[in-house]
Amino acid sequence: MRYDSALFCPESCVLQFIYSQLIRLILPFILLRLWWNGRRAPDLRRNWYQRLGIVPRASGTVVWVHAVSVGETIAAAPMVRRLLVRNPGITILMTAMTDTGLAQARKMFGDQVQYAYAPYDTPGAIRRFLDRANPRILVIMETEIWPNMIRQCRARRVPVFLINARLSERSARGYERIRGLAVPIMRSISWVAAQAEKDAERFRRIGVAPAKVAVTGSVKFDVDIPEDVRAAARTLRHKLAGRPVWIAGSTHGNENDQLIAAHVKVLEKHPDALLILVPRHPDRFEPVAEKTLKEGLVLARRSMGEDPAGAQVYLGDTMGELMMLYGASDLAFVGGSLIERGGHNPLEPAGWGIPVFSGPHFFNFETIYQRLLDDRGVKLVSDADDLAAHVSSLFSDHREREAIGLRALEVVNKNRGALDKVVDGIIERV
């Protein structure tokens, strides 16, 4: 193994040391929380040791693809498929920070790729992981910047690529406040494939060399809906027998309460309407089910195989099926936006050609939402009452509903192409 002899400045070494010590100090509490949460969800305890870098040894040419959770894993899928087609001899190792992210990856790829939890960002965990996985390159989806991960990859001359990279102005200012730590890490990145010019400018501003930054667009526009997903959506839609259906996907916390309240109002004008409610995190499944029943609504749970035909709320309490559930719906609300979570990916429902709703908080997907807004493929709502009014209105106006959905799909189609640029960029740099 060859090591890069480049040295960081003394200030960065001190800050790196302080950062690593802080991570070491809080690690026992992180593991305790993992064990505690595992009482209710035993899967959280499974393979916990992988988070300390103890993963199965890999052989051959290993491409390490890291995606923090479900959304980033879905975004990585077309890229992974393309890399496997163009380089059938490589081994793809997919990692995620969450069990939901790994579950999504397994659902999409089966035994085509290898899987592991991403190691916590301590020097020891990263070292053990790299010793065992021995990756040829590291591909990070979006902006998961972990100092020890990137620093040790540089030391081992493992190129680090940030793909579909985005950086908000708020995050850029945060990195500027710790320039002594951030700049050397940014200079260790081999290539940044930014979603938009403003993202590229911010990465250059915080230390990435201009020659290593390219604007490729967002690979999320290259949304890929497999035929088996389309078939499953058609089957579910057939079961719903022409009912007006709206879906709220990737919802958070008390946002679920607001959506249930909105559906109660929708039912006043459309008594046969169905809400498909899909919380972002599994630990919200039970509270959402209880809240639904408390409001006097008829509930069906997908995890239990219950028939949604007679239900008023269909709880999507399974993993990896959100894309299919979008396809069985007439309208879609994308969660994390009625509260200050920054929203989630609106291109998943837009790829089905259905109207998209969002609350006012979509700063995590600002560029994508702006393109949808420019072409009137998304409707913004201020609160639950506003959402209920818009949903009810579009249920009554088939022509307008179809027009908005087609505009959303057109935005997706005309912005495709980032995937080819990203895959070509990775291959030519390896």
Please state what every model-predicted region is.
Residues 7-430:
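Nucleotide-activated sugar donor-binding and catalytic core shared by glycosyltransferases
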